[in-house]
A protein has these predicted regions:
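Extended, loop-rich substrate-binding clefts of extracytoplasmic carbohydrate-active enzymes
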Residues: 57, 74, 142, 147-194
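Active-site pocket scaffolds in enzymes
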Residues: 279-338
Length: 338
């Protein structure tokens, strides 16, 4: 088993749902205040791309939010709304702590249609990213079973469809839930500027556990009023070979041509998304592995993660108490308008 890929400095924290949440001072720096924190039942004013009316964020049919854990600023907060000149973002706490919307210069960049919790916005993956073969893994000499969320496999972790809680205006937290056989939790922090959005994640363990984390954004291929379809510029050094079940193995092979639903590593430079005549976005991350999914006709996914799919069964990172697993992702954009 591999050691954690990086170590962090001393953390300070507070107890969230029985878990000590460490706010690593090297990671969670102060960020600009959000414009709004929207409570349950309040009406949310439209973001710039919505064209008027009101907008309700949260999956239909979600249960009422449970009582907040100690340290949460308000158990009724459902949405964080961040803004900067020319940019607005919504973070939906009810729908898995995801970025539900990112509007730049009046245009939405993310898929917002909601066929299911794995199909929209940009959601966090924890305590595992990607598929886990047959929804099981062995740790400490014991076979651990997971919920088969993509039968017969498990996929994308236990926090993407559960309710998060606001810790402050830019920070949210959740425990790992009943479908994970270890005790721990996740903290996310967000920072928005006029030309970038940064997401930081920490997974905290109350006991040694294998884990990986990452993000799964859905970027729209076509944006109304722009000149053409989204282009992806990426140069991976290697690709994890997939087996007959479609799950990444430990074997590294030369990258195959598109379409992709594959995990890559050793990228020569950060991936770049380009909407011709509108916007260019560079995706930066300290994650070593990237899943890229190009098959959908209306969107594509570029997913930084700390380990490849099925890492719990191959070469798991073991997270220790007091030594959180952390990752950072930044979307940085510039205008291509003439």
């Amino acid at each position: 088993m591999s050691e954690q890929r990086k170590k962090k400095g001393e953390s300070v924290g507070q107890t969230i749902g029985g878990m000590l949440v460490g706010f690593d001072q090297q990671i969670f720096r102060s960020t600009p205040p959000v414009n709004e924190m929207v409570a349950k039942g309040d009406r949310l004013a439209p973001v710039a791309a919505s064209g008027g009316g009101t907008m309700r964020v949260g999956l239909p049919g979600d249960p009422a939010a449970p009582d907040a854990a100690p340290g949460a600023i308000d158990p009724e907060i459902e949405v964080l709304r961040l803004s900067a000149p020319g940019v607005e973002a919504l973070v939906d706490l009810v729908a898995g702590g995801r970025i539900a919307s990112l509007v730049v210069d009046g245009r939405e960049l993310l898929r917002t249609s909601r066929d299911g919790p794995r199909d929209w916005g940009s959601f966090p993956m924890a305590p595992y990213a990607g598929r886990i073969r047959d929804a099981e893994f062995t740790f400490g000499g014991e076979v651990r079973r997971l919920a088969a969320t993509m039968p017969p496999h498990a996929i994308h972790g236990t926090v993407l469809d559960r309710r998060w809680h606001a810790i402050d205006g830019t920070t949210i937290a959740i425990d790992l839930g009943p479908d994970w056989p270890f005790v721990g939790g996740v903290v996310q922090s967000f920072e928005l500027t006029s030309d970038s959005m940064t997401c930081r994640m920490e997974l905290h363990a109350d006991e040694p556990m294998p884990a990986s984390i990452g993000w799964h954004p859905w970027f729209l291929r076509r944006i109304a009023g722009t000149a053409g379809e989204l282009e992806l510029d990426v140069e991976p050094g290697a690709m994890y070979a997939r087996d007959a079940a479609g799950i990444a193995t430990e074997e590294l092979v030369p990258p195959a041509p598109e379409p992709w639903d594959d995990c890559f590593t050793d990228l020569r430079r950060p991936p770049v998304l380009r909407w011709p005549g509108f916007l260019e976005m560079t995706i930066e991350s300290d994650c070593p592995d990237w899943v890229i999914y190009t098959s959908p006709s209306d969107a594509l996914c570029v997913e930084p993660q700390t380990a490849p799919p099925d890492a719990l069964n191959t070469d798991p990172t073991v997270v220790q108490p007091g030594r959180p697993l952390s990752a950072v992702m930044t979307w940085r954009w510039r205008s291509l308008a003439p």
